[in-house]
Amino acid sequence: FFFFYLAKSLENATNFWPDWDYKTDTYSQSTKIKTSEVKKIEKTFNQTTDSFLKEKYWFLTMKAYFYSENQNNAIAFFNTTSSTIEKGISYYRAFSYVAGINYTQNKIALSNYQYAVVFENCPMLRKEAILNFKPQETKDFNESLKMVKNNEEKAALWALYGYYADPVEAISKIYT
């Protein structure tokens, strides 16, 4: 029940979405989770030995950092702990948080690459990846292409590009 208590404690920050405003800039008005609160959740993650609960506390920690006063802590936490987590929906949702933070920091190429990885590896999050992928400049897309590690990531990146820009070119690049 402690997990539910911690998850519920985040709702003021995570469920902020004024029904009268569809613009995302109102996010800055939402309640931010205090770093001290996130540290309590992280401590629980570190102390948990059950693998199922550990994954749940890991994701809860990521979510709390994402909605916290300092989102950079989410990236640091992900980079130091993600290798211990199975690459399932929790992992890729957390990775999409990292991609979102990179987007807000104007790291467009990195963010787009990360959303392509989510798109490729987690079908349940494909809609989220499509909606958050933002091909803005050709140079950003070319930078994203330089980051791919295999043909699957390359195909995912081109598929997302094709959704927003030139589907014929994207298909030709996927199959060549």
Give the ranges of each region predicted by the language model.
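N-terminal alpha-helical interaction modules that lie
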Residues: 1-33, 118-119, 123, 132, ...
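Repeat-solenoid scaffold signature
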Residues: 89-112, 116-117, 166-171
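Helix-turn-helix repeat elements of alpha-solenoid scaffolds
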Residues: 26-41, 66-79, 105-107, 131-137, ...
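"A position-specific structural signal for the A-helix of alpha-solenoid helical repeats
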Residues: 55-62, 93-101, 153-160
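Extended alpha-helical scaffold segments
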Residues: 14-15, 136-140, 169, 176
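Alpha-solenoid helical-repeat scaffolds
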Residues: 33-51, 55-56, 60-61, 66
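Solenoid-like repeat scaffolds
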Residues: 42-52, 78-89, 114-124, 141-150, ...
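Alpha-helical linker/edge segments of TPR/alpha-solenoid repeat scaffolds
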Residues: 70-71, 100-114, 127, 133-155
